[in-house]
Amino acid sequence: MELRTAASPKDVKHYTTDRLREEFLIDDLFKVNEIKLVYSHIDRIITGSAVPVNQELKLTAGDELRAEYFLQRREMGIINIGGKGTITIDGTVYELEYKDGMYIGMGAKDISFASVDATNPAKFYINSAPAHTSYPTVLIKPENCVNVELGSLEGSNHRVICKYILPGQVESCQLVMGMTQLKPGSVWNTMPCHTHDRRMEVYLYFDMQENDMVFHYMGEPTETRHIIMRNEQAVISPSWSIHSGCGTKAYTFIWGMVGENQDFDDMDACDLKDLR
């Protein structure tokens, strides 16, 4: 498990491109037959992936958590962005199709990942946050989620937000998770942009071709920077930072938030005329 420390906006505005990428970009997810995990000190979120091809992958706590098992004091959200796969939780097998999700509550001990077809393996994307109590484990189908259509083609930001884990739908201690899919011809996400000082966020960009990219904008509104994102790469966004992107084509991204509250609409809007 890789560890990432928190960074101050006073320091970040002086970072080079390489340093920005080193601190915030996660560019080595979805390795074949591996579970890859990145532990951020920002609200203690863990971001990761599991790609079982010809073997089952078992989730273990590792020394970093100092726990008997991974979810002893944590909860987890998962979205499958690959082929059909299974997640086995304490002996119960759940089958996940493409873009199906899973919430696993605190206290689940034995968790393993497998693919149904090794030639089209599952790609499980993982977010995990500290938890204080146990909520029920839920298999999540996107067609049963709250879906909100926003933006317009004229604004180049026509998109559908699919909310997987949030209060009133799938309960959690603090993790809020979902997916945003841009419509063809739209390239902007989260513009006009915002911050939310009560929560940090991680984005995973995918559904992109090899030569496509997203310019992910971050930093304080008056000190913006960008990181170029490729397919199936994630980026950590501190609570003080904007988080917005513009791609060469339409794309999809998964967002996961942890922090002080779970109010999706608790945002501090940025006036576009103030952006620099």
Curated annotation (Swiss-Prot):
Q: Which co-factor is required?
A: Zn(2+)
Record's catalysed reaction(s)? 5-dehydro-4-deoxy-D-glucuronate = 3-deoxy-D-glycero-2,5-hexodiulosonate
Under InterPro entries, the record lists: KduI, KduI/IolB_isomerase, KduI_N, RmlC-like_jellyroll, RmlC_Cupin_sf
Q: Recorded E.C. number(s)?
A: 5.3.1.17
Which parts of the sequence bind Zn(2+)? H194, H196, E201, H243
Does this UniProt record's set of keywords contain Isomerase?
A: yes
Q: Record's Pfam families?
A: KduI (PF04962)
* Biological process (GO), any one: D-glucuronate catabolic process
Which pathway does the UniProt entry assign to this protein? Answer: Glycan metabolism; pectin degradation; 2-dehydro-3-deoxy-D-gluconate from pectin: step 4/5
> What CDD domains does the entry give?
cupin_KduI_C (cd20491), cupin_KduI_N (cd20294)
Provide the family line: Belongs to the KduI family.
Q: What's this protein's function?
A: Catalyzes the isomerization of 5-dehydro-4-deoxy-D-glucuronate to 3-deoxy-D-glycero-2,5-hexodiulosonate.
Name by which UniProt lists this protein:
4-deoxy-L-threo-5-hexosulose-uronate ketol-isomerase
In which organism is this protein found?
Lachnoclostridium phytofermentans (strain ATCC 700394 / DSM 18823 / ISDg)
